[in-house]
Amino acid sequence: MGQSQSQIFEDLISNSSFSNEEIERIRKRFIKIDANQSGSIDRNEFLSIPSVASNPLASRLFSVVDEDGGGDVDFQEFINSLSVFSVHGNKEEKLKFAFKIYDIDRDGYISNGELYLVLKMMVGTNLREDQLQQIVDKTIMEVDKDRDGKISFEEFKDIVSGSNVTSSMTLDSF
């Protein structure tokens, strides 16, 4: 038999950085986003969130938030992702989330092709393909310390942790 609603709620509180009140506000927001009232947020519903819709990486965000790859985001996945962006979310969690944006095949590495695809989403048609490929190749050469042709999480963390990326991944309130 499954867990009771109160047990699920208690688990959400203990496994996230949110208070009771914040989880309740997030639950109400989740219900509003879930337009077809299926109990989960599908890709189209997710992409209809105004702050997400305007992001060039919206489809990648959905893929990362959809932790199990099931094609929709349940409330647990929603809370887990928002927890990363809370003021209480730690730097390591934020960096792992950012890394997953680039790690399209979820193999724990960012390949040349994955970096190219994600950067292409960000720059659109502002760069020629050969210019973008040069940037990707140069980035891989500079970041790939063990010379295996791909970027591991540790290599990513080394290069990104000196920036303010994690502070821009923090939302003040929910």
Swiss-Prot record:
Keywords: Calcium, Metal-binding, Repeat. Ca(2+) 1 binds at D34, N36, S38, S40, E45. GO terms for molecular function: calcium ion binding; calcium-dependent protein serine/threonine phosphatase regulator activity; phosphatase activator activity; phosphatase binding. Ca(2+) 2 binds at D66, D68, D72, E77. GO terms for biological process: calcineurin-mediated signaling; intracellular calcium ion homeostasis; regulation of cell morphogenesis. The keyword Repeat applies. GO terms for cellular component: calcineurin complex; cell division site; cytoplasm; cytosol; nucleus. SMART domains: EFh. It holds the Pfam family EF-hand_5. SUPFAM superfamilies: EF-hand. Ca(2+) 4 binds at D144, D146, D148, K150, E155. InterPro entries: EF-hand-dom_pair (IPR011992), EF_Hand_1_Ca_BS (IPR018247), EF_hand_dom (IPR002048). Ca(2+) 3 binds at D103, D105, D107, Y109, E114. Residues 21-56, 60-88, 90-125, 131-166 form the EF-hand domain. Composed of a catalytic subunit (A) and a regulatory subunit (B). PANTHER family: PROTEIN PHOSPATASE 3 REGULATORY SUBUNIT B ALPHA ISOFORM TYPE 1. Belongs to the calcineurin regulatory subunit family. Regulatory subunit of calcineurin, a calcium-dependent, calmodulin stimulated protein phosphatase. Confers calcium sensitivity. This protein has four functional calcium-binding sites. This is Calcineurin subunit B. It comes from Schizosaccharomyces pombe (strain 972 / ATCC 24843). The gene is cnb1.
